[in-house]
Structure formats: C-alpha cells, structure tokens
UniProtKB/Swiss-Prot annotation:
This is Potassium-transporting ATPase potassium-binding subunit. The lineage of its organism: Bacteria, Pseudomonadati, Pseudomonadota, Betaproteobacteria, Burkholderiales. It comes from Burkholderia mallei (strain ATCC 23344). InterPro entries: KdpA. It comes from the Bacteria. Keywords: Cell inner membrane, Cell membrane, Ion transport, Membrane, Potassium, Potassium transport, Transmembrane, Transmembrane helix, Transport. It holds the Pfam family KdpA.
Length: 602
C-alpha cells in the first residue's frame, strides 16, 4: 500500500460521501412527492397509472406489497425467458444469433430479474441487440427499482406508527424508475460516451490485423466448454488469425444502468475491463462511483424519513469504515505481490516504470489502486461487474471480495438490498445488546419482539444455507466437479465463490470454473431466486410489523443507536455472523491457497 493507492482511495470516499448528501435529499423529496420534478412530470406519471389501471392513492399491506413484488418479477422472468428463446426470429439481430438453450435462457432470465446478472455465456456471441435493449437493459432498471422500493417500504415501517400499510408497490416502482434511475442513467451514459464508450446498432466490424497470429486454442463443445482428453487435459487446435472482428452495440446506455443499478452484467465478455465498456481511468472512477452512490444516499434517506438524521449517518459510517478497511486489505494484498515471485528475485516493487505487485489479470490503464477500488466496490455492493479477472487475484485478494459477498453485501450493498440487509443486522445487534443488559430491544423508537427476530433469522440464515449447501452438492456431484479447471483449493474456491455470488445476487465469478452446463444453470438459478425473494418477503414482513407498532419514547435505559459505540456493535455483529458461518469453508479455499504460496516459495 503506497501513497498513490491511499490518495486514490481517500479521494474516492470523500467524493462519494459528499455526493450522497444532495442525492439523498433528492430521493427523499421524490418519494414523498414534494420534489419539483414530480410536479412537472406528474401528468406523465398519472397517465401511466391510468393506462395500467392503478389507483395511486390506495396503499398496500405488507402481504399485498410482497405479492405484487414477487408477481411483478416472476412475470419479468417469463418475458425475458421467452425473448431469449425466440431472439433468432426477431429483428435487431444483425449477427444472426440463435435462441439460447432452455437452461441457459432460464438462468439468464432469473439472473437479470434478481439483480444478479450472473453470465455464463459470452454476450457478444450469444445475445442480440434487441434482447440486450428490450430484455436485459429493461430488467436492469426494474430489478434495481425493486430493491430500492423494498428498502423504502422498510423505512416507512420504522417511520410510521399504528399503520396497516407500507406504501403502494406500483407507485414506488414508477417513481424510482421515472425520476431516479432514468435521469441518473442518462447523465452517466453521456459521460461514458464522452470517454469513448460506444453506442450504436451497427453490425460487427471485421478489420485486418497488422500480422498473422498463430496459437493453440482449446477445442470447445456445443455448450462452449473446453473439451478434455482421457487424462483430463484440454484438447487444443492450432489456429491462425489474419483478421479481427470488433463487436459493436448500444453499450453506453446499458453500461450506465448496469453500474447505477448495481446490476453488473457486461455487454461484452470482458465486462468493464473491455475498452468499449470502460476505456479510461476517469470512466473507471465514474463506474465505481455509480455503483455506490445510490446505496450511500439511501442511508441518509433512512435518517431523513424517520426524522433522525443521526441514525442514517451512523449506518453510513459503519459501511464506510468497513469499505475503507476492505480497500486497504485488498490493495495491500495485490500490491504486495506473491512470495513465489519474490523467491525468484523478481522485482515486484512499484516504481515510475511499473505498477509492481500482482498485475496478472489487471488492466494497465487502471493499475492496482483503481482495480482494488473496483474489486471491493463491486462485491461490497451486489454489482458483480469487473474491471479485472478475480480468478487472478492473490489468495487474500480473492478472499476479500468473497467475504464481502458472504457477509450479505451489507457494506453499502446493492441499491436497496444493501441497506435493508444492514438494517436487519441492526435489529440483530440491538437484540443481542438487549439480551446482555436484560432489556427489551428497541431501534429508532420501535420495540423489537419475537416476530421481528424470527424474520431476521430467516434473512440471516437463508443465504448461507444456499451458499454452503450449493457448494457441497457441486463438490460431491460429478457434474459439479467436471467444471473445475484448477483442481485443489483454488478449484474449491471457484465453486464457493460461484454460489456466494449467486445466492447473494452479485454475479461476479472466478473465471476458471465452467458453469455453462445444465447442472450449474439450474443450481445457480435456484440460489439466485431464493437468495433474492427469500429475503425480500421477510424484510417486508418486518416492515409491516414495525409500521403497526406504536412509537415509544427513548429513556435513560435505551441503547443509543446513533453513536460510535453502536457503529462498533453493528460492525461486530456483521463480522461475527460472517466469520462463524463461512470461516471453515474459507479456510479450505483461500486459506490453504495462501499457505501454499509460501510452500512454493521454498
């Protein structure tokens, strides 16, 4: 960790927190209807309600809200699945791509609807422009809006008292999409285009290369997976290349909401390491900023809405401290290089002539500082976009993003999902504190009783169950082990990372695992769906229960939840639950792999 790395991280955090304040103010006014933007575009909003037959003045109970949420997203899965299956017969397909397989289309549909954007295919070789724009990009907006409205419903649960409703799902989704996501995405898309991100609907361009390139390429089967011989080694074929095909497409418009909505699915297989998605250091900084700005602002929206800004600041402070620590560990691990190369007297020190450290799988235009920022931001949030190959990170460098996902992505987290996950941990923290001092736990004026803790338990335990059971099945099943390209602890890490990513709706991956198979498509689809809606429904149940409670006044015995002590308690709860749940699995994967580096060095 050198001065350059520290300075870049510090500048980013300062810019993020400074920008979160006005964005939070705007979000608060949009959702309560007091914003001038809502008044100006009110006729359009009301026209949409009339067209859909919605009464915007009728609010919903938590059960109605949950039913609308699940039904809306289930219809999204069906529509996107159908679109991917028939894309070969639709216009907007200049490359003539055929339909996806049944399991591949279902996996992709579930992936984008759940805000995961897990991609086990090569987008520029699989998905047509129409499917990208009408299917994937639309779901990038709607899945992000779903996460935001769920946390807004939970915030209303804290803010209201003796109420039977928590808002109207259709009104919330419309306002978030129309007034927040669309204008912010348009601004980010314009900035990305100014940096060189492409936006067109041209057919792919064939250009001659400067010289003929010959190489041994792996032979692929019909599903795009490497073919292996009887000994398990990849079968290769000699290939010569005299021309290069440059993929085109409407990239900037999808890239903007991909980052802003913490979606993460790339237009290209290289994701944000591809120069057409992320060409410059400024575009990289902008994309990292876009990932975290709404999650950061929502913390302050929480404080604004419940009438105590200190509560939102405390949650934001806990997230920021954890983010800064993760950036420090990640960047230090990558900047430090590997003991194996050090034993061979390879110079890994940063200098004016080299970035130093572990540059494998990284883009030289970003270096270790911006790559470390991106790795942490994309896994602290439920984004999953990458500007470097996570499979090439050092063992400790790979452990950091894996653990951030396994903690529930509550360090900022996805748009909406991060804050409602952290508020669930806040309820758990005050419950534990209440047990220690023998008092009924309270949080922001609401008593936390057995019903809320049952729902909290479901949220906290469900995703670890999906991750660990899914990993166990994949390790034991022949179909699961067949996808491992790197046997040993790293192969185990790849499977653990895959299910951590799917169940926590992240979408990033260690690239050494071949997952475009029926086994992994079905397994990860199940993990993604229940990881998303298996937590959303209990969160809405908590919102409904809290809204019905009376607000109680703070007394001398009430635990203050706005100071440094609570920040420490909250972080301790998050880390303790994560450590107890995942430490054995992490020891078998990244832990063993890290120790093997020192064995190899000697």
């Amino acid at each position: 960790m050198n001065a350059n790395n520290l300075l870049q991280a510090a500048i980013f955090i300062v810019v993020l927190i400074a920008a979160a304040v006005p964005v939070a103010r705007y979000l608060t006014r949009v959702m309560d209807g007091s914003s001038a933007v809502v008044r100006v575009f009110g006729p359009l909003e009301r026209a949409l309600y009339r067209l859909a037959g919605i009464d915007p003045l009728t609010e919903m109970s938590w059960k109605q809200y949950a039913l609308a949420t699940v039904a809306f997203n289930a219809l999204g899965v069906l529509f996107l699945y159908a679109l991917l299956r028939v894309q070969g017969w639709l216009p907007g397909n200049p490359q003539g791509f055929g339909p996806m397989t049944v399991d591949g289309a279902l996996n992709t549909a579930v992936s984008f609807v759940t805000n995961t954007n897990w991609q086990d295919y090569t987008p520029e070789q699989t998905v047509s422009y129409l499917a990208q724009m009408l299917g994937l990009t639309v779901q990038n907006f709607l899945s992000a809006a779903t996460g935001i409205v769920v946390v807004l419903a939970l915030i209303r649960g804290f803010a209201r008292h003796t109420a039977q409703t928590i808002g109207n799902f259709w009104v919330d989704v419309t306002r978030v999409t129309l007034y927040v996501l669309v204008p912010m995405a348009a601004i980010i898309a314009a900035l990305l285009m100014s940096q060189g991100v492409i936006q067109n609907t041209k057919a792919y361009q064939d250009v001659p290369t400067l010289q003929t390139t010959s190489y041994a390429a792996p032979r692929l089967d019909a599903q795009g997976n490497p073919v292996k011989d009887a000994k398990g080694n990849p079968v290769t074929v000699q290939t010569s290349v005299k021309a290069q095909t440059l993929a085109m497409g409407p990239v900037a418009s999808q890239e903007a909401i991909k980052m802003l909505g913490t979606n993460g699915g790339g237009f290209f297989n290289g994701n944000s390491s591809h120069p057409y998605e992320n060409p410059t250091p400024f575009s990289n900084f902008l994309e990292i900023f876009a990932i975290l700005i709404i999650p950061a602002a929502l913390c302050l929206v929480f404080g604004n809405t419940i009438g105590d800004r200190r509560q939102g600041v405390a949650v934001l402070a806990a997230m920021t401290v954890a983010l800064a620590a993760a950036i420090g560990i990640e960047t230090s691990a990558e900047q430090g290089g590997t003991p194996v190369l050090a034993s061979l007297n390879v110079d890994q020190a940063a200098s004016p002539l080299q970035a130093g450290g572990n540059m494998e799988g990284k883009e030289t235009r970003f270096g270790i500082a911006q790559t470390g920022l991106f790795v942490v931001a994309t896994t602290a949030a439920s984004c999953g976009a990458v500007d470097a190959m996570h499979d090439s990170l050092t063992p400790v460098g790979g452990l950091v993003p894996m653990l951030l996902m396994q903690l529930g992505e509550v360090i900022f987290g996805g748009v909406g999902s991060g804050l409602y996950g952290m508020l669930v941990f806040a309820l758990l923290a005050v419950f534990v504190a209440g047990l220690m001092i023998g008092r009924t736990p309270e949080y922001v004026g609401k008593k936390i009783e057995s019903y809320e803790m049952k729902m909290v338990s479901i949220v906290v335990l469900l995703t670890p169950l999906l991750v660990l059971v899914g990993t166990s099945i994949a390790v034991l099943a022949d179909a699961g082990r067949a996808g491992i390209a790197n046997p040993g602890p790293h192969g185990f890490s790849e499977i653990l990372y895959a299910f951590s990513s799917a169940a926590n709706n992240n979408g990033s991956a260690f690239g050494g695992l071949s997952v475009n198979t029926p086994f992994y498509n079905w397994m990860t689809a199940i993990a993604m769906w229940f990881g998303r809606f298996g937590t959303i429904v209990p969160v809405l149940a908590i919102a409904g229960s809290l809204a019905a409670k009376k607000r109680i006044a703070a007394t001398s015995g009430t635990l203050p939840t706005h100071g440094p002590l609570f920040v420490v308690l909250l972080l301790g709860t998050v880390l303790l639950v994560g450590a107890l749940t995942y430490m054995p699995a992490l020891a078998l994967g990244p832990g063993v792999e890290h120790l093997m580096l020192f064995v190899g060095a000697h």
